[in-house]
Regions:
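Positively charged n-region of N-terminal signal peptides that target proteins for export
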Residues: 1-5, 111-113
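Sec-dependent N-terminal signal peptides
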Residues: 5-14
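Sec/Tat signal peptide C-region and signal peptidase I cleavage site
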Residues: 15-20
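Subset of outer-membrane beta-barrel
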Residues: 21-320
Length: 320
């Protein structure tokens, strides 16, 4: 009921506050399931396989019309130094829905092969279809909140994403700008924000006591800044990965913060996963710590994957 009330308010305001959400996809923790390509175009083609990942997230379980998100992604090496990637997604949040895709090209350069010193560049083309189903705003026996709104609202957007990745031994740092093009002001209400750019930073360190150690510890941080409304968030993560030749399993934890509310986590949760042969599996749970926690039992994420067509490249700049 609270969610429906918020939607009615959006309708009464003429819809611009809802339309400001298009092309602003939810940032979940799917990237921690060895799926960095979802947030950084520069990771396309890093690895010795064609990597396919199917991921689904169900937020705020127990809350009616709660958001859910699904993605299917794949990336592969092209030649010895380049990569290609494709990601398809579906996002539903109450009575709004987004579907879209991104197609990515990346290129990887070696600065020093002996020290595993590399730099990568990536670019993605983005297409997004956004829709609001106003028919569901009306309850039995109640009129529509705004009689002037008589049809469903839908649009298609095109945009781009660019990024750079720096790697030195176990250190990695990647920066990307998403939705680099502004919207056409003539298509929207004067109050509609036209700047959709997001700036994403993903950095961390993979630590092994010795090169032959079976345990790897990976602390990392993800920061997102939205230029349009100056909002930003930070994920603080840690993963422990145990290797058994080419197989491995891992456990980890993540905490999300809104940056203007320091030291007050928005959500926390454990994660785990494994890679056995060509198959991959990961699961994550997030517990909300804000006021909505009383109305739901948390959020769940699951990732299934397969790594196909094993083949070692001719350049260690594409090794994971």
């Amino acid at each position: 009921m609270m969610k429906k009330l918020a939607l009615y308010i959006c309708v009464l305001m003429g819809m611009p506050s809802v339309f400001g959400q298009e092309l602003q996809l939810p940032t979940g923790n799917q990237y921690l399931a060895d799926s960095e390509f979802l947030i950084m175009p520069t990771y396309a083609g890093i690895g010795n396989n064609v990597r396919v990942r199917l991921s689904a997230t169900s937020q705020w379980v127990g809350f009616k019309e709660a958001p859910d998100y699904q993605s299917l992604s794949g990336d592969m090496r092209l030649g010895n130094r380049s990569g290609l990637g494709l990601s398809l997604y579906n996002d539903r949040n109450g009575y709004t829905k987004q579907m879209g895709a991104k197609a990515t090209f990346s290129h990887h350069l070696t600065l020093d092969s002996y020290d595993s010193h590399f730099v990568s560049f990536g670019i993605s083309y983005l297409v997004n279809a956004f829709r609001i189903d106003i028919d569901k705003f009306t309850e039995a026996g109640r009129p529509r909140a705004d009689a002037a709104v008589t049809d469903n609202r839908a649009m298609i957007n095109h945009n781009f994403e660019v990024g750079v990745l720096y790697r030195y031994k176990g250190i990695f740092a990647s920066l990307a700008a998403t939705n680099i093009l502004n919207k056409n002001k003539e298509m929207f209400d004067v109050k509609e924000p036209t700047t959709l750019r997001n700036y994403n930073l993903y950095a961390g360190y993979r630590y092994k006591r010795t090169p032959s150690s079976i345990l790897e510890i990976e602390p990392s941080v993800f920061v997102q800044y939205r230029e349009g409304d100056s909002r930003s968030l930070t994920d603080a993560n840690v993963k422990f990965r145990w290797f058994d030749f080419e197989d491995y399993y891992w456990v980890g934890a993540t905490a999300r913060f809104v940056n203007d509310q320091a030291f007050k986590p928005l959500s926390v949760g454990p994660m785990l996963g494994l890679k056995k042969g060509v198959f991959y599996f990961a699961y994550g749970y997030n517990l909300n710590l804000n006021t909505i926690r009383s109305y739901n039992s948390g959020s769940h994420m699951i990732t299934l994957g397969i790594d196909m067509f094993q083949g070692i490249g001719g350049c260690n700049c594409t090794e994971r």
